[in-house]
Protein backbone atom coordinates (compact mmCIF):
# COMPACT_ATOMS: atom_id res chain seq x y z
CA UNK A 1 0.00 0.00 0.00
CA UNK A 2 1.37 3.41 -1.00
CA UNK A 3 2.27 5.94 1.70
CA UNK A 4 -0.31 8.63 2.44
CA UNK A 5 0.05 12.34 3.07
CA UNK A 6 -2.24 13.72 5.80
CA UNK A 7 -3.12 17.40 6.29
CA UNK A 8 -5.02 18.85 9.26
CA UNK A 9 -7.34 21.78 10.16
CA UNK A 10 -6.47 25.16 8.61
CA UNK A 11 -3.74 23.73 6.37
CA UNK A 12 -6.25 21.21 4.95
CA UNK A 13 -8.99 23.83 4.51
CA UNK A 14 -6.59 26.29 2.83
CA UNK A 15 -5.63 23.66 0.25
CA UNK A 16 -9.30 22.80 -0.31
CA UNK A 17 -10.16 26.47 -0.73
CA UNK A 18 -7.39 26.96 -3.31
CA UNK A 19 -8.84 24.10 -5.36
CA UNK A 20 -12.38 25.46 -5.01
CA UNK A 21 -11.22 28.93 -6.12
CA UNK A 22 -9.31 27.61 -9.14
CA UNK A 23 -12.34 25.74 -10.48
CA UNK A 24 -14.91 28.40 -9.54
CA UNK A 25 -12.88 31.24 -11.08
CA UNK A 26 -12.71 29.36 -14.38
CA UNK A 27 -16.44 28.57 -14.34
CA UNK A 28 -17.88 31.89 -13.11
CA UNK A 29 -16.62 33.95 -16.07
CA UNK A 30 -19.37 32.25 -18.12
CA UNK A 31 -22.26 33.55 -15.96
CA UNK A 32 -24.90 35.89 -17.35
CA UNK A 33 -25.73 37.35 -20.78
CA UNK A 34 -22.31 39.00 -21.02
CA UNK A 35 -20.37 36.04 -19.66
CA UNK A 36 -17.17 35.11 -21.53
CA UNK A 37 -16.19 31.89 -23.24
CA UNK A 38 -13.73 29.30 -21.95
CA UNK A 39 -11.44 27.48 -24.40
CA UNK A 40 -10.75 23.84 -23.50
CA UNK A 41 -7.80 22.01 -25.02
CA UNK A 42 -8.61 18.58 -26.44
CA UNK A 43 -5.98 15.85 -26.83
CA UNK A 44 -7.27 15.32 -30.37
CA UNK A 45 -9.06 17.68 -32.74
CA UNK A 46 -9.73 21.39 -32.37
CA UNK A 47 -10.05 23.03 -28.93
CA UNK A 48 -13.59 23.29 -27.59
CA UNK A 49 -15.13 26.69 -26.89
CA UNK A 50 -17.98 26.71 -24.38
CA UNK A 51 -20.08 28.90 -22.12
CA UNK A 52 -21.51 25.90 -20.29
CA UNK A 53 -20.37 25.83 -16.64
CA UNK A 54 -20.51 22.07 -16.18
CA UNK A 55 -18.44 21.42 -19.33
CA UNK A 56 -15.68 23.65 -17.93
CA UNK A 57 -15.89 22.06 -14.47
CA UNK A 58 -15.59 18.54 -15.88
CA UNK A 59 -12.33 19.39 -17.64
CA UNK A 60 -10.47 20.68 -14.57
CA UNK A 61 -8.02 18.35 -12.85
CA UNK A 62 -5.33 19.87 -10.59
CA UNK A 63 -1.79 18.60 -9.97
CA UNK A 64 -1.84 19.06 -6.17
CA UNK A 65 -3.87 16.15 -4.71
CA UNK A 66 -5.39 18.23 -1.89
CA UNK A 67 -6.35 21.18 -4.10
CA UNK A 68 -7.80 18.69 -6.56
CA UNK A 69 -10.10 17.31 -3.84
CA UNK A 70 -11.63 20.78 -3.40
CA UNK A 71 -12.02 21.21 -7.16
CA UNK A 72 -13.65 17.77 -7.53
CA UNK A 73 -16.12 18.47 -4.72
CA UNK A 74 -17.12 21.68 -6.48
CA UNK A 75 -17.37 19.83 -9.79
CA UNK A 76 -19.92 17.60 -8.02
CA UNK A 77 -22.07 20.70 -7.35
CA UNK A 78 -22.14 21.59 -11.05
CA UNK A 79 -22.82 17.99 -12.14
CA UNK A 80 -25.66 17.57 -9.63
CA UNK A 81 -27.30 20.77 -10.80
CA UNK A 82 -26.99 19.63 -14.43
CA UNK A 83 -28.42 16.17 -13.63
CA UNK A 84 -31.41 17.36 -11.61
CA UNK A 85 -32.44 20.59 -13.35
CA UNK A 86 -30.30 20.56 -16.50
CA UNK A 87 -29.06 24.12 -15.93
CA UNK A 88 -27.90 26.50 -13.20
CA UNK A 89 -24.46 24.88 -13.03
CA UNK A 90 -22.54 28.16 -12.97
CA UNK A 91 -24.90 29.72 -10.41
CA UNK A 92 -24.44 26.66 -8.17
CA UNK A 93 -20.65 26.92 -8.47
CA UNK A 94 -20.65 30.65 -7.62
CA UNK A 95 -22.90 30.06 -4.59
CA UNK A 96 -20.77 27.15 -3.34
CA UNK A 97 -17.56 29.19 -3.65
CA UNK A 98 -19.12 32.07 -1.70
CA UNK A 99 -20.34 29.77 1.11
CA UNK A 100 -16.98 27.95 1.36
CA UNK A 101 -15.00 31.22 1.45
CA UNK A 102 -17.13 32.84 4.16
CA UNK A 103 -17.41 29.57 6.08
CA UNK A 104 -13.63 29.02 6.09
CA UNK A 105 -13.12 32.51 7.56
CA UNK A 106 -15.67 31.76 10.29
CA UNK A 107 -14.03 28.41 11.17
CA UNK A 108 -10.59 30.08 11.25
CA UNK A 109 -12.05 32.66 13.68
CA UNK A 110 -12.96 29.82 16.06
CA UNK A 111 -16.64 29.14 15.28
CA UNK A 112 -18.01 25.61 15.63
CA UNK A 113 -18.18 24.09 12.09
CA UNK A 114 -21.17 21.86 12.94
CA UNK A 115 -23.21 24.81 14.22
CA UNK A 116 -22.26 26.78 11.11
CA UNK A 117 -23.56 23.88 9.01
CA UNK A 118 -26.84 23.81 10.95
CA UNK A 119 -27.22 27.56 10.43
CA UNK A 120 -26.55 27.18 6.70
CA UNK A 121 -29.14 24.37 6.45
CA UNK A 122 -31.73 26.49 8.30
CA UNK A 123 -31.12 29.44 5.97
CA UNK A 124 -31.28 27.34 2.78
CA UNK A 125 -34.61 25.79 3.82
CA UNK A 126 -36.05 29.29 4.45
CA UNK A 127 -34.80 30.63 1.10
CA UNK A 128 -36.13 27.63 -0.85
CA UNK A 129 -39.55 28.06 0.80
CA UNK A 130 -39.55 31.78 -0.08
CA UNK A 131 -38.54 31.13 -3.70
CA UNK A 132 -41.31 28.52 -4.07
CA UNK A 133 -43.99 30.88 -2.74
CA UNK A 134 -42.97 33.57 -5.27
CA UNK A 135 -42.90 31.11 -8.17
CA UNK A 136 -45.52 31.61 -10.88
CA UNK A 137 -46.82 29.02 -13.35
CA UNK A 138 -45.75 29.24 -16.97
CA UNK A 139 -48.60 29.32 -19.46
CA UNK A 140 -47.92 30.75 -22.90
CA UNK A 141 -45.50 29.77 -25.65
CA UNK A 142 -43.92 33.23 -25.35
CA UNK A 143 -42.95 32.56 -21.73
CA UNK A 144 -41.46 29.19 -22.69
CA UNK A 145 -39.46 30.95 -25.43
CA UNK A 146 -38.24 33.57 -22.90
CA UNK A 147 -36.92 30.88 -20.52
CA UNK A 148 -35.16 29.16 -23.44
CA UNK A 149 -33.66 32.46 -24.62
CA UNK A 150 -32.24 33.34 -21.18
CA UNK A 151 -30.78 29.87 -20.70
CA UNK A 152 -29.20 29.94 -24.17
CA UNK A 153 -27.40 33.17 -23.19
CA UNK A 154 -29.78 35.53 -24.95
CA UNK A 155 -30.17 33.57 -28.22
CA UNK A 156 -33.80 34.25 -29.23
CA UNK A 157 -33.72 31.78 -32.12
CA UNK A 158 -33.00 28.92 -29.69
CA UNK A 159 -35.81 29.99 -27.34
CA UNK A 160 -38.35 30.07 -30.16
CA UNK A 161 -37.31 26.68 -31.56
CA UNK A 162 -37.65 25.04 -28.13
CA UNK A 163 -41.09 26.63 -27.63
CA UNK A 164 -42.15 25.25 -31.04
CA UNK A 165 -40.79 21.80 -30.17
CA UNK A 166 -42.69 21.71 -26.87
CA UNK A 167 -45.80 22.90 -28.68
CA UNK A 168 -45.50 20.03 -31.19
CA UNK A 169 -44.82 17.10 -28.84
CA UNK A 170 -46.52 18.42 -25.70
CA UNK A 171 -44.82 18.96 -22.36
CA UNK A 172 -44.51 15.18 -21.86
CA UNK A 173 -42.99 14.57 -25.30
CA UNK A 174 -39.32 13.78 -25.84
CA UNK A 175 -36.94 16.40 -27.31
CA UNK A 176 -33.43 15.45 -28.45
CA UNK A 177 -30.64 17.71 -29.71
CA UNK A 178 -28.37 16.71 -32.62
CA UNK A 179 -25.73 18.36 -34.79
CA UNK A 180 -26.95 19.47 -38.23
CA UNK A 181 -25.00 19.23 -41.46
CA UNK A 182 -25.80 22.76 -42.66
CA UNK A 183 -25.71 26.32 -41.31
CA UNK A 184 -29.29 26.57 -40.05
CA UNK A 185 -30.81 25.29 -36.83
CA UNK A 186 -34.00 23.40 -37.61
CA UNK A 187 -36.71 21.39 -35.89
CA UNK A 188 -37.87 17.91 -36.91
CA UNK A 189 -40.73 16.07 -35.25
CA UNK A 190 -40.50 12.30 -35.58
CA UNK A 191 -42.99 9.75 -34.32
CA UNK A 192 -41.26 7.72 -31.64
CA UNK A 193 -41.20 6.42 -28.10
CA UNK A 194 -38.80 6.71 -25.17
CA UNK A 195 -38.74 4.58 -22.03
CA UNK A 196 -36.49 4.69 -18.97
CA UNK A 197 -34.40 1.57 -19.40
CA UNK A 198 -30.78 1.65 -20.60
CA UNK A 199 -28.48 -1.00 -22.07
CA UNK A 200 -27.83 -4.10 -19.95
CA UNK A 201 -24.10 -4.08 -20.68
CA UNK A 202 -21.77 -1.21 -21.66
CA UNK A 203 -20.28 -3.56 -24.30
CA UNK A 204 -23.36 -2.86 -26.45
CA UNK A 205 -22.24 0.78 -26.92
CA UNK A 206 -21.49 1.85 -30.51
CA UNK A 207 -20.32 5.40 -29.69
CA UNK A 208 -17.74 5.14 -26.90
CA UNK A 209 -17.32 8.92 -26.45
CA UNK A 210 -21.02 9.51 -25.69
CA UNK A 211 -21.60 6.01 -24.26
CA UNK A 212 -24.58 5.48 -26.57
CA UNK A 213 -25.73 2.48 -28.62
CA UNK A 214 -27.21 3.51 -32.00
CA UNK A 215 -28.99 0.85 -34.06
CA UNK A 216 -30.02 1.72 -37.64
CA UNK A 217 -33.07 -0.11 -39.04
CA UNK A 218 -32.98 -2.88 -36.38
CA UNK A 219 -35.24 -5.85 -35.76
CA UNK A 220 -36.86 -5.66 -32.31
CA UNK A 221 -37.53 -8.82 -30.30
CA UNK A 222 -40.11 -8.15 -27.57
CA UNK A 223 -40.10 -10.93 -24.96
CA UNK A 224 -42.17 -11.02 -21.79
CA UNK A 225 -40.01 -13.32 -19.64
CA UNK A 226 -36.34 -13.59 -18.63
CA UNK A 227 -33.79 -14.82 -21.16
CA UNK A 228 -30.99 -16.81 -19.53
CA UNK A 229 -30.34 -19.84 -21.76
CA UNK A 230 -28.85 -19.56 -25.23
CA UNK A 231 -30.61 -22.48 -26.93
CA UNK A 232 -34.11 -20.93 -27.38
CA UNK A 233 -32.51 -17.74 -28.81
CA UNK A 234 -30.39 -19.46 -31.49
CA UNK A 235 -32.99 -19.77 -34.32
CA UNK A 236 -33.94 -16.08 -34.20
CA UNK A 237 -30.27 -14.96 -33.84
CA UNK A 238 -29.27 -16.99 -36.91
CA UNK A 239 -32.14 -15.52 -38.95
CA UNK A 240 -31.15 -11.96 -37.94
CA UNK A 241 -27.45 -12.57 -38.74
CA UNK A 242 -28.42 -13.73 -42.25
CA UNK A 243 -30.52 -10.58 -42.76
CA UNK A 244 -27.45 -8.43 -41.90
CA UNK A 245 -29.52 -6.03 -39.75
CA UNK A 246 -29.00 -5.10 -36.06
CA UNK A 247 -31.17 -6.58 -33.31
CA UNK A 248 -32.66 -5.01 -30.17
CA UNK A 249 -33.89 -7.40 -27.49
CA UNK A 250 -36.44 -6.07 -24.99
CA UNK A 251 -37.10 -8.63 -22.23
CA UNK A 252 -37.79 -8.81 -18.49
CA UNK A 253 -34.06 -9.50 -18.13
CA UNK A 254 -31.22 -10.99 -20.15
CA UNK A 255 -28.63 -12.80 -18.05
CA UNK A 256 -26.13 -15.63 -17.84
CA UNK A 257 -25.29 -17.50 -21.02
CA UNK A 258 -27.67 -15.45 -23.19
CA UNK A 259 -26.12 -12.10 -22.20
CA UNK A 260 -22.56 -13.45 -22.47
CA UNK A 261 -23.22 -14.76 -26.00
CA UNK A 262 -24.77 -11.46 -27.14
CA UNK A 263 -21.79 -9.49 -25.78
CA UNK A 264 -19.26 -11.82 -27.45
CA UNK A 265 -21.15 -11.58 -30.76
CA UNK A 266 -21.27 -7.79 -30.48
CA UNK A 267 -17.52 -7.53 -29.74
CA UNK A 268 -16.52 -9.87 -32.56
CA UNK A 269 -18.70 -7.95 -34.97
CA UNK A 270 -20.79 -10.91 -36.08
CA UNK A 271 -24.06 -9.40 -34.88
CA UNK A 272 -24.82 -5.77 -34.02
CA UNK A 273 -27.02 -6.33 -31.00
CA UNK A 274 -28.20 -4.59 -27.83
CA UNK A 275 -30.54 -5.65 -25.06
CA UNK A 276 -32.58 -3.63 -22.57
CA UNK A 277 -34.92 -4.52 -19.74
CA UNK A 278 -38.64 -4.12 -20.37
CA UNK A 279 -40.07 -0.88 -18.92
CA UNK A 280 -42.52 -0.86 -15.99
CA UNK A 281 -43.55 -3.66 -13.64
CA UNK A 282 -46.30 -6.30 -13.46
CA UNK A 283 -49.42 -5.64 -15.54
CA UNK A 284 -48.11 -2.22 -16.55
CA UNK A 285 -45.04 -3.89 -18.08
CA UNK A 286 -47.30 -6.15 -20.20
CA UNK A 287 -49.26 -3.11 -21.40
CA UNK A 288 -46.08 -1.17 -22.26
CA UNK A 289 -44.64 -4.12 -24.18
CA UNK A 290 -47.93 -4.25 -26.14
CA UNK A 291 -47.51 -0.50 -26.85
CA UNK A 292 -43.98 -1.09 -28.18
CA UNK A 293 -45.19 -4.04 -30.28
CA UNK A 294 -47.97 -1.96 -31.87
CA UNK A 295 -45.58 0.95 -32.48
CA UNK A 296 -42.95 -1.24 -34.17
CA UNK A 297 -45.31 -3.62 -35.98
CA UNK A 298 -44.13 -6.67 -34.03
CA UNK A 299 -45.59 -9.18 -31.58
CA UNK A 300 -45.02 -9.70 -27.87
CA UNK A 301 -43.44 -13.15 -27.54
CA UNK A 302 -45.40 -14.56 -24.62
CA UNK A 303 -46.07 -18.08 -23.34
CA UNK A 304 -49.64 -16.92 -22.51
CA UNK A 305 -50.27 -16.48 -26.24
CA UNK A 306 -48.74 -19.88 -26.96
CA UNK A 307 -45.73 -18.40 -28.81
CA UNK A 308 -42.42 -20.05 -27.89
CA UNK A 309 -39.09 -18.31 -28.48
CA UNK A 310 -37.82 -21.28 -30.54
CA UNK A 311 -40.66 -20.80 -33.07
CA UNK A 312 -40.20 -17.06 -33.60
CA UNK A 313 -39.76 -15.92 -37.21
CA UNK A 314 -38.51 -12.57 -38.52
CA UNK A 315 -42.04 -11.37 -39.37
CA UNK A 316 -42.95 -11.56 -35.64
CA UNK A 317 -40.19 -9.04 -34.80
CA UNK A 318 -40.84 -5.32 -34.79
CA UNK A 319 -38.73 -2.88 -36.79
CA UNK A 320 -37.89 0.81 -36.50
CA UNK A 321 -35.82 3.36 -38.41
CA UNK A 322 -33.42 4.00 -35.52
CA UNK A 323 -33.08 3.03 -31.87
CA UNK A 324 -30.82 5.04 -29.53
CA UNK A 325 -29.91 3.54 -26.15
CA UNK A 326 -28.10 5.43 -23.38
CA UNK A 327 -27.30 4.08 -19.91
CA UNK A 328 -30.70 5.32 -18.68
CA UNK A 329 -33.05 5.58 -21.68
CA UNK A 330 -34.08 3.88 -24.91
CA UNK A 331 -35.64 5.89 -27.76
CA UNK A 332 -37.38 4.12 -30.64
CA UNK A 333 -37.82 6.44 -33.63
CA UNK A 334 -40.13 5.85 -36.61
CA UNK A 335 -41.49 2.40 -35.69
CA UNK A 336 -42.95 0.34 -38.53
CA UNK A 337 -46.38 -0.04 -36.86
CA UNK A 338 -49.62 0.56 -38.78
CA UNK A 339 -51.02 4.05 -38.08
CA UNK A 340 -54.59 2.76 -37.66
CA UNK A 341 -53.45 0.28 -34.97
CA UNK A 342 -51.52 3.00 -33.11
CA UNK A 343 -54.55 5.34 -33.22
CA UNK A 344 -56.81 2.56 -31.94
CA UNK A 345 -54.39 1.87 -29.08
CA UNK A 346 -54.30 5.60 -28.19
CA UNK A 347 -58.12 5.73 -28.20
CA UNK A 348 -58.20 2.69 -25.90
CA UNK A 349 -55.76 4.36 -23.45
CA UNK A 350 -57.81 7.59 -23.50
CA UNK A 351 -60.95 5.61 -22.65
CA UNK A 352 -59.13 3.92 -19.74
CA UNK A 353 -57.95 7.35 -18.49
CA UNK A 354 -61.57 8.54 -18.33
CA UNK A 355 -62.67 5.44 -16.40
CA UNK A 356 -59.84 5.25 -13.86
CA UNK A 357 -60.30 6.63 -10.34
CA UNK A 358 -56.66 6.39 -9.21
CA UNK A 359 -54.51 9.49 -9.74
CA UNK A 360 -51.38 7.34 -9.97
CA UNK A 361 -52.88 5.11 -12.67
CA UNK A 362 -54.10 8.17 -14.57
CA UNK A 363 -50.60 9.70 -14.50
CA UNK A 364 -49.01 6.47 -15.78
CA UNK A 365 -51.65 6.12 -18.54
CA UNK A 366 -51.02 9.73 -19.63
CA UNK A 367 -47.30 8.93 -19.84
CA UNK A 368 -48.04 5.94 -22.08
CA UNK A 369 -50.32 8.05 -24.26
CA UNK A 370 -47.66 10.77 -24.64
CA UNK A 371 -45.10 8.14 -25.63
CA UNK A 372 -47.40 6.62 -28.23
CA UNK A 373 -48.84 9.81 -29.71
CA UNK A 374 -46.43 12.61 -28.79
CA UNK A 375 -43.46 11.50 -30.80
CA UNK A 376 -39.91 12.78 -30.57
CA UNK A 377 -38.84 16.29 -31.55
CA UNK A 378 -35.30 16.58 -32.88
CA UNK A 379 -33.58 19.98 -32.82
CA UNK A 380 -30.73 19.95 -35.35
CA UNK A 381 -28.18 22.62 -34.44
CA UNK A 382 -26.35 24.20 -37.38
CA UNK A 383 -23.32 26.47 -37.62
CA UNK A 384 -20.45 27.62 -39.83
CA UNK A 385 -17.82 25.43 -38.16
CA UNK A 386 -17.70 22.29 -36.03
CA UNK A 387 -16.49 24.30 -33.01
CA UNK A 388 -19.44 26.71 -33.33
CA UNK A 389 -21.95 23.85 -33.66
CA UNK A 390 -20.63 22.13 -30.52
CA UNK A 391 -20.75 25.39 -28.52
CA UNK A 392 -24.31 26.12 -29.71
CA UNK A 393 -25.42 22.54 -29.01
CA UNK A 394 -24.30 22.96 -25.37
CA UNK A 395 -26.47 26.07 -25.09
CA UNK A 396 -29.49 24.42 -26.73
CA UNK A 397 -29.18 21.47 -24.33
CA UNK A 398 -29.12 23.85 -21.34
CA UNK A 399 -32.06 25.83 -22.68
CA UNK A 400 -34.14 22.71 -23.30
CA UNK A 401 -33.63 21.42 -19.75
CA UNK A 402 -34.38 24.85 -18.32
CA UNK A 403 -37.69 25.12 -20.18
CA UNK A 404 -38.66 21.63 -18.97
CA UNK A 405 -37.87 22.71 -15.40
CA UNK A 406 -39.90 25.91 -15.90
CA UNK A 407 -42.96 23.97 -17.05
CA UNK A 408 -42.56 21.64 -14.06
CA UNK A 409 -42.14 24.10 -11.16
CA UNK A 410 -42.82 27.55 -12.64
CA UNK A 411 -40.65 30.66 -13.04
CA UNK A 412 -39.27 33.55 -10.98
CA UNK A 413 -37.32 36.74 -11.72
CA UNK A 414 -33.94 35.94 -13.28
CA UNK A 415 -30.52 37.55 -13.17
CA UNK A 416 -29.81 36.27 -9.63
CA UNK A 417 -32.48 38.64 -8.27
CA UNK A 418 -34.73 35.90 -6.82
CA UNK A 419 -31.98 34.73 -4.46
CA UNK A 420 -30.95 38.28 -3.56
CA UNK A 421 -34.49 39.23 -2.48
CA UNK A 422 -35.06 35.84 -0.81
CA UNK A 423 -32.40 36.87 1.73
CA UNK A 424 -35.16 38.94 3.42
CA UNK A 425 -36.78 35.64 4.49
CA UNK A 426 -33.76 35.02 6.75
CA UNK A 427 -34.77 37.87 9.10
CA UNK A 428 -37.55 35.73 10.58
CA UNK A 429 -35.24 32.84 11.58
CA UNK A 430 -34.34 32.22 15.22
CA UNK A 431 -31.04 30.31 15.47
CA UNK A 432 -30.21 28.27 18.60
CA UNK A 433 -26.85 29.98 19.22
CA UNK A 434 -24.43 32.64 17.93
CA UNK A 435 -22.54 30.24 15.64
CA UNK A 436 -25.75 29.19 13.89
CA UNK A 437 -26.54 32.88 13.40
CA UNK A 438 -23.16 33.24 11.66
CA UNK A 439 -24.13 30.28 9.41
CA UNK A 440 -27.31 32.14 8.42
CA UNK A 441 -25.30 35.32 7.70
CA UNK A 442 -22.90 33.29 5.51
CA UNK A 443 -25.86 32.29 3.33
CA UNK A 444 -27.18 35.88 3.32
CA UNK A 445 -23.87 37.11 1.89
CA UNK A 446 -23.59 34.18 -0.54
CA UNK A 447 -27.04 34.96 -2.00
CA UNK A 448 -25.58 38.20 -3.40
CA UNK A 449 -22.83 36.33 -5.28
CA UNK A 450 -24.77 35.50 -8.50
CA UNK A 451 -26.00 39.11 -8.96
CA UNK A 452 -22.50 40.49 -8.30
CA UNK A 453 -20.89 38.05 -10.73
CA UNK A 454 -23.42 38.73 -13.53
CA UNK A 455 -22.81 42.48 -13.07
CA UNK A 456 -19.02 42.08 -13.01
CA UNK A 457 -19.07 39.96 -16.18
CA UNK A 458 -20.99 42.84 -17.79
CA UNK A 459 -18.25 45.28 -16.70
CA UNK A 460 -20.18 46.93 -13.83
CA UNK A 461 -19.33 47.05 -10.11
CA UNK A 462 -21.18 44.12 -8.53
CA UNK A 463 -21.33 45.63 -5.03
CA UNK A 464 -23.03 48.80 -6.35
CA UNK A 465 -25.64 46.76 -8.27
CA UNK A 466 -26.39 44.48 -5.29
CA UNK A 467 -26.71 47.50 -2.97
CA UNK A 468 -29.14 49.28 -5.30
CA UNK A 469 -31.33 46.18 -5.69
CA UNK A 470 -31.51 45.56 -1.94
CA UNK A 471 -32.98 49.08 -1.47
CA UNK A 472 -36.03 48.05 -3.55
CA UNK A 473 -39.01 46.24 -2.02
CA UNK A 474 -40.14 44.89 -5.43
CA UNK A 475 -38.93 41.27 -5.65
CA UNK A 476 -38.94 41.39 -9.48
CA UNK A 477 -36.83 44.56 -9.69
CA UNK A 478 -33.34 43.78 -10.97
CA UNK A 479 -30.40 44.69 -13.17
CA UNK A 480 -30.76 43.64 -16.80
CA UNK A 481 -27.12 42.97 -17.72
CA UNK A 482 -28.01 42.61 -21.41
CA UNK A 483 -29.24 46.23 -21.70
CA UNK A 484 -27.61 47.76 -18.61
CA UNK A 485 -30.99 48.96 -17.28
CA UNK A 486 -32.58 48.57 -13.81
CA UNK A 487 -36.16 47.35 -14.41
CA UNK A 488 -38.86 44.79 -13.64
CA UNK A 489 -37.14 41.65 -14.97
CA UNK A 490 -40.25 39.47 -15.26
CA UNK A 491 -41.97 42.03 -17.54
CA UNK A 492 -39.00 42.12 -19.94
CA UNK A 493 -38.68 38.33 -19.94
CA UNK A 494 -35.53 37.89 -17.83
CA UNK A 495 -36.77 34.84 -15.94
CA UNK A 496 -35.33 31.67 -14.41
CA UNK A 497 -37.03 28.33 -13.76
CA UNK A 498 -37.75 27.94 -10.03
CA UNK A 499 -36.41 24.38 -10.09
CA UNK A 500 -33.03 25.55 -11.45
CA UNK A 501 -32.60 28.24 -8.78
CA UNK A 502 -33.72 25.88 -5.99
CA UNK A 503 -31.45 23.02 -7.11
CA UNK A 504 -28.45 25.35 -7.52
CA UNK A 505 -28.75 26.65 -3.95
CA UNK A 506 -29.46 23.25 -2.35
CA UNK A 507 -26.57 21.55 -4.18
CA UNK A 508 -24.15 24.39 -3.43
CA UNK A 509 -25.01 24.52 0.28
CA UNK A 510 -24.84 20.74 0.63
CA UNK A 511 -21.28 20.42 -0.71
CA UNK A 512 -20.03 23.73 0.72
CA UNK A 513 -21.13 22.88 4.27
CA UNK A 514 -19.32 19.53 3.99
CA UNK A 515 -16.13 21.32 2.93
CA UNK A 516 -16.40 23.74 5.87
CA UNK A 517 -16.66 20.84 8.34
CA UNK A 518 -13.49 19.17 6.98
CA UNK A 519 -10.80 18.75 9.65
CA UNK A 520 -8.36 16.29 8.01
CA UNK A 521 -7.45 15.23 4.46
CA UNK A 522 -5.69 12.09 3.29
CA UNK A 523 -4.06 11.70 -0.13
CA UNK A 524 -1.63 9.25 -1.66
CA UNK A 525 1.99 10.39 -1.99
CA UNK A 526 2.95 9.89 -5.64
CA UNK A 527 5.79 7.39 -5.97
CA UNK A 528 8.96 8.73 -7.56
CA UNK A 529 9.92 6.26 -10.23
CA UNK A 530 13.73 5.91 -10.63
CA UNK A 531 15.12 6.99 -13.98
CA UNK A 532 15.99 4.18 -16.37
CA UNK A 533 19.72 3.32 -16.50
CA UNK A 534 21.66 4.60 -19.49
CA UNK A 535 21.96 2.07 -22.33
CA UNK A 536 25.33 0.32 -22.66
CA UNK A 537 27.59 0.97 -25.65
CA UNK A 538 27.55 -1.44 -28.58
CA UNK A 539 30.76 -3.24 -29.56
CA UNK A 540 32.61 -2.83 -32.88
CA UNK A 541 31.08 0.59 -33.53
CA UNK A 542 34.30 2.62 -33.39
CA UNK A 543 34.88 4.03 -36.85
Swiss-Prot record:
InterPro entries linked: Chaperonin_Cpn60_CS, Cpn60/GroEL, Cpn60/GroEL/TCP-1, GroEL-like_apical_dom_sf, GROEL-like_equatorial_sf, TCP-1-like_intermed_sf
Keyword tags: ATP-binding, Chaperone, Cytoplasm, Isomerase, Nucleotide-binding
GO biological process terms held by the UniProt record: protein refolding
The EC number(s) this enzyme carries: 5.6.1.7
Subcellular location: Cytoplasm
PROSITE patterns: CHAPERONINS_CPN60
Keyword Cytoplasm: yes
Positions that bind ATP: 30-33, 51, 87-91, 415, 496
Gene Ontology annotations for the cellular component aspect, listed alphabetically: cytoplasm
Molecular-function GO terms, alphabetical: ATP binding; ATP-dependent protein folding chaperone; isomerase activity; unfolded protein binding
First-listed, main subcellular location of the protein, grouped into a coarse class: cytoplasm
Catalysed reactions, as listed in the record: ATP + H2O + a folded polypeptide = ADP + phosphate + an unfolded polypeptide
Keyword presence, Magnesium: no
Quaternary structure note: Forms a cylinder of 14 subunits composed of two heptameric rings stacked back-to-back. Interacts with the co-chaperonin GroES.
Annotated PANTHER family: 60 KDA HEAT SHOCK PROTEIN, MITOCHONDRIAL
Purpose: Together with its co-chaperonin GroES, plays an essential role in assisting protein folding. The GroEL-GroES system forms a nano-cage that allows encapsulation of the non-native substrate proteins and provides a physical environment optimized to promote and accelerate protein folding.
Similarity-based family: Belongs to the chaperonin (HSP60) family.
The protein's name: Chaperonin GroEL 1
Native species: Rhodospirillum rubrum (strain ATCC 11170 / ATH 1.1.1 / DSM 467 / LMG 4362 / NCIMB 8255 / S1)
Gene: groEL1
Amino acid sequence: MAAKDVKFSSDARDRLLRGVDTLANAVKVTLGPKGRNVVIDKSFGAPRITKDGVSVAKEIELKDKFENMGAQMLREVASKSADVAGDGTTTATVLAQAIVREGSKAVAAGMNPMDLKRGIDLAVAAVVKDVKTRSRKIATNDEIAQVGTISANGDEEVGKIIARAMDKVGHEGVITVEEAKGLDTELDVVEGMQFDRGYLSPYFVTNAEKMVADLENPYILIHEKKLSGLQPLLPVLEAVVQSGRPLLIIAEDVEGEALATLVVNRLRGGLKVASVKAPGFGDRRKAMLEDIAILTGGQVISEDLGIKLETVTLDMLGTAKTVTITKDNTTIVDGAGVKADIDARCAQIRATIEDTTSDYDREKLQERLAKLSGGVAVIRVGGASEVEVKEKKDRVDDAMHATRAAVEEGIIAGGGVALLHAAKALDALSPANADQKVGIEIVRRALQAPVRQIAENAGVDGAVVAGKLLESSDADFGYNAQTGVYENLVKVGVIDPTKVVRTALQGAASVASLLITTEAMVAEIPEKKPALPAGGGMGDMDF
